[in-house]
Curated annotation (Swiss-Prot):
GO terms for biological process: cell morphogenesis; division septum assembly; regulation of cell division; regulation of cell septum assembly. The gene is minC. Pfam families: MinC_C, MinC_N. The keyword Translocase does not apply. This is Probable septum site-determining protein MinC. Residues 106-145 are annotated as: Disordered. NCBIfam families: minC (TIGR01222). Transmembrane segments: none annotated. Interacts with MinD and FtsZ. PANTHER family: SEPTUM SITE-DETERMINING PROTEIN MINC.
Length: 261
């Protein structure tokens, strides 16, 4: 076999970031209902994002129909690309998806039966659930936060950390940083008077007149009425990290510098 380098292709080691969809229940009906609830307001939020199904949090002896979970994720427009499992979960390779090795911290061992969360309560690490559904497992990891306002302006004056989510039925005003992995969603306009490093979605019910205003734009994703842009398409230097307004014009996101003086 020739070892001469080909001018047409190259094979080399590398790594690709994906979302982890961590399954914590074998009740697929409850899991499906939670997914629908999570994405019904923002169906475009993770559209076309690649995701790995993580089953390491299931208790010893538990197993799920990965083909069904794969279809659930397809139904919400996510793209399952593999499965992350423990060495003892040999069944995880039966779904036709490749087994992947995650480089995150190792999943904690399952709780004893008398301490475990009820199986009927679904939980997904990427989903935001009401605070009463489950207590955070580790104090260092913030629980997802969902705040709804009945049509009026919602003001948030605390920093938002990874995994936290804010949802406003009207306009949303944020006075503190939005970290990577945090999500702010509004049916109206979004105003951020701090760095935006997470995701911001305005006009999520199809309000094409909604706008996003930000004093320091460094986002993972921005979206208005389902039209979105991610960091895969780098922002121009004249708006990256700057004060901007974002609006829609003929189904295209317009990102414009704000003149504050």
């Amino acid at each position: 076999m020739s070892l001469k380098k080909s001018p047409f292709f190259e094979l080399r080691s590398g790594s690709v970031d994906t979302l982890l969809f961590t399954v914590k229940t074998t009740d697929l009906d409850a899991l499906r209902a939670e997914l629908v609830k999570r994405f019904e307001a923002t169906p475009e939020f993770f559209a076309d994002d690649v995701v790995a199904i993580d089953v390491r949090r299931l208790a010893d002896g538990e197993r799920v129909a990965l083909a069904d979970i794969r279809q659930m994720l397809n139904d919400v427009r996510m793209r399952p690309v593999g499965v992350v499992a423990l060495a003892t979960q040999g069944w995880a390779g039966e779904a036709g998806l490749p087994l992947l090795e995650a480089r995150d911290r190792r999943a904690p061992a399952a709780k004893p039966a008398d301490e475990a969360e009820p199986a009927a309560v679904p939980a997904v690490e990427t989903a935001a659930a009401p605070a009463a559904a489950a207590a955070p497992e580790q104090p260092s990891e913030p629980a997802p936060t969902l705040v709804q306002a009945g049509g009026q302006t919602l003001v948030i004056d605390r920093p938002l950390r990874s995994g936290q989510q804010i949802y406003a039925k009207g306009d949303l005003v944020v006075l503190a940083p939005v970290s990577h992995g945090a999500e702010i969603i509004a049916e109206g306009n979004i105003h951020i008077y701090a760095p935006l490093r997470g995701r911001a979605l305005a006009g999520v019910h199809g309000n094409h007149d909604a706008r996003i205003f930000c004093t320091c734009l460094e986002p993972e994703l921005i979206s208005i009425a389902g039209i979105y842009r991610t960091t895969e398409n780098p922002l121009p230097a004249d708006v990256l990290g700057k004060s901007v307004q974002i609006r829609l014009e003929e189904e295209k996101l317009m990102i414009e510098p704000l003149r504050l003086t």
